Amino acid sequence: MRERVLFFDLLRCVAAVAVIAIHVLAPYRNELGVIPMDQWLTAVGVNSVTRWAVPVFILITGALMLSDARPFDGKYYVKRRLGKVLVPFLIWSTFYAYLSGWTAQGFGFETVKEVLSNSPFHATYYHLGFFYYFIPLYFVIPLFQWMARNVDDNVLYTYLAFWMFTSTLFLFKIDGPWSNQMWLYMGYLPLGYVLFQKVPLNRSMVTLFTGFGLVALAVTFTMVVTNSLEAEKYTVGRWLSYKTLNVILAASMIFMLCRYFGEGLPKNVQKVVSFISQHSLGIYLLHPIFLWPMKEFGWYTGHPAWVIPVWIVLSGAGALAMSYLFSKSAKTRWLLP
């Protein structure tokens, strides 16, 4: 049990930091030919090697929920699982629709109205897009739970092999029924379960996953840079999608590395990791508030090698502190479950 706690705590921490990094570097991405090449390469490099962040959160969900051996209770599931995520999402979507109306020039109510009217189809703020494909996954989790308990492991392995094959087709723009967003995201659920429950935890296996992951990251960075230089503008194709083989391999690597090294953390580090993990969803939901002035007032002048870490710390610490304050009251802690 101790391994499980530390393992998932560490995963949530590294994923939260990586998500913030992706959002911090955003102003640099499209500056090819505007800022020095080394600065652009730094930002694009960080973007290329952190795309596993969001998929890792889905892997965690799959690993935990598919490992749950309790009988399925529909009422409990809707109230305690789905509702626990859906209701806060709706409230934060409304808040961020309001925030979207604020710019350095002032407040625009028309922008808020437009954002809210489009909210059934588009996120009200850039980081909330995650929930538009994460929440629907709750409708297929019971199916995967049944499969995990009742079918032979080879069925799961065959499913994952086919899913990864279709993600490869999608990466290379070979589209078909397999290009459906729900199909491409839901494979992360049984993958998380298999990585947690079925893959042996030994050095050779972790080395294998690490090798595949590092190659995937290197290829991703190379393709993004090459395509952008050829087009003379920032061009990523599908290499930075969350639904492609390269990102699946990178996310699997992070999962296995955290699983392998999680137990070796010093006690003082474990405490910090556990605290951050408890507030990882709060950090995810709240950090854009602290990035708002950076983006609106252009407070990112400087080399991204130091600007990105600085804003990760500032926005991450601010979001962590705010999440902690929310957790101190029963009236507010449900907003950041």
What would you call each of these model-derived segments?
Residues R4-A16, V78-K79, G83, R203-A216, ...:
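Functional transmembrane helices that form membrane-embedded active or gating regions
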Residues L6-S67, P88-F89, S93:
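Functionally critical transmembrane alpha-helices in membrane proteins and complexes, commonly lining
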Residues V17-V24, S93-T94, L160-K173, F212-N227, ...:
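Aromatic-anchored segments of alpha-helical transmembrane domains
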Residues T42-P55, N118-Y133, F170-Y188, F221-M253:
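Interfacial loop-to-helix transition and helix-capping segments at the boundaries
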Residues N47-V56, D68-S100, F109-T124, L137, ...:
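Transmembrane alpha-helical segments and their boundary/interface "anchor" motifs
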Residues F57-I58, L66-S67, F95-Q105, T111-F196:
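Hydrophobic alpha-helical segments with transmembrane-like composition
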Residues N202-S274:
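Alpha-helical transmembrane segments and terminal signal-anchor/GPI-anchor hydrophobic tails
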Residues R238-L249, Y300-L320:
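Membrane-interface transmembrane-helix boundary segments in multi-pass integral membrane proteins
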